């Protein structure tokens, strides 16, 4: 079974995000559990936590149908110790918020070397950051998102994801989220069924589908292998609709949240409905 949704607003409280997802006829959703552009946020109030859980139960969202995203400020591979510690503490807080809400997944961008440390050292530092967070929390899986490779961001090669996973002690609590726009921009072609198969065979060989915990379904304004992260609506960009139909028909993508981050929220209901139709 496919779980399809979008990254919805949590304005007015995280409990409101659940209602917005339901209004889209989504069977999965993503959200920020705090302001994604600030380091600090108030603790989640007990009544808001209760309402979030009640709404999830009412509308049928299980703990692995929700894929929250952490703050954009966090860099778990930061080359400077003070900034790294700040990121690690913020990431632990994000994991704890998921724990409180009964969510089993936390999606994050792995980190950036900022041209101050080599790639392997940065990847090892990211894995160490994940280990620290997992040791201070329970149940929540750290879900590494592939990146487009813009700037000094790591995670744009499947080998980067595999190296991070290799350094994580508890393999049961680490996974990956594949963003189609990021993959395309990083040089993994998705424009035909044949190249989709080749790309996902590569993924299976290097990372493994057992680690796939979610996907971001986005077309791309950016060019193939451009290392530029620019999302577009499904079928409107340089990828086209083929891979999204491919994903919806392939059982390897069952049982995980498939999340739209496309640029026009007004057409999310139509995009979700179209994706669901592709299963037939």
Curated annotation (Swiss-Prot):
Endonuclease IV plays a role in DNA repair. It cleaves phosphodiester bonds at apurinic or apyrimidinic (AP) sites, generating a 3'-hydroxyl group and a 5'-terminal sugar phosphate. Zn(2+) 1 binds at residues 69, 109, 145. Pfam families: AP_endonuc_2. The keyword Repeat does not apply. This is Probable endonuclease 4. SMART domains: AP2Ec (SM00518). InterPro entries: AP_endonuc_2, AP_endonuc_F2_Zn_BS, Xyl_isomerase-like_sf, Xyl_isomerase-like_TIM-brl. It comes from Photorhabdus laumondii subsp. laumondii (strain DSM 15139 / CIP 105565 / TT01). The gene is nfo. Belongs to the AP endonuclease 2 family. Binds 3 Zn(2+) ions. Zn(2+) 3 binds at residues 182, 229, 231.
């Amino acid at each position: 079974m496919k779980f399809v949704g979008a990254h919805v607003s949590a304005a007015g409280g995280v409990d409101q995000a659940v209602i917005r997802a339901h209004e889209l006829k989504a069977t999965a959703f993503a959200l920020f559990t705090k302001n994604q552009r600030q380091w600090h946020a108030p603790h989640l109030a007990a009544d808001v936590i209760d309402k979030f859980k009640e709404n999830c139960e009412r509308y049928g969202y299980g703990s692995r149908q929700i894929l929250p995203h952490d703050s954009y400020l966090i860099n778990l591979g930061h080359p400077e110790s003070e900034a790294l510690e700040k990121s690690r503490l913020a990431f632990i807080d994000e994991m704890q918020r998921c724990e409180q809400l009964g969510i089993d997944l936390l999606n994050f961008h792995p980190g950036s070397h900022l041209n101050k440390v080599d790639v392997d050292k940065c990847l090892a530092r990211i894995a160490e950051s994940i280990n620290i967070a997992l040791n201070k929390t329970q149940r929540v899986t750290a879900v590494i998102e592939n990146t487009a490779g813009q700037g000094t961001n790591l995670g744009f090669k499947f080998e980067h994801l595999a190296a991070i996973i290799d350094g994580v002690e508890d393999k049961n609590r680490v996974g990956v989220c594949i963003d189609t726009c990021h993959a395309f921009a990083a040089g993994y072609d998705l424009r035909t069924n044949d190249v989709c198969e080749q790309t996902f065979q590569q993924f299976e060989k290097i990372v493994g589908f057992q680690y796939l915990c979610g996907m971001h379904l986005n077309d791309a304004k950016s060019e193939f292998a451009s290392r530029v992260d620019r999302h577009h609506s499904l079928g409107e960009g340089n990828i086209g609709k083929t891979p999204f139909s491919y994903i919806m028909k392939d059982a390897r993508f069952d049982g995980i949240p498939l999340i739209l981050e496309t640029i026009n929220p007004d057409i999310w209901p139509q995009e979700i409905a179209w994706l669901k139709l592709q299963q037939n």
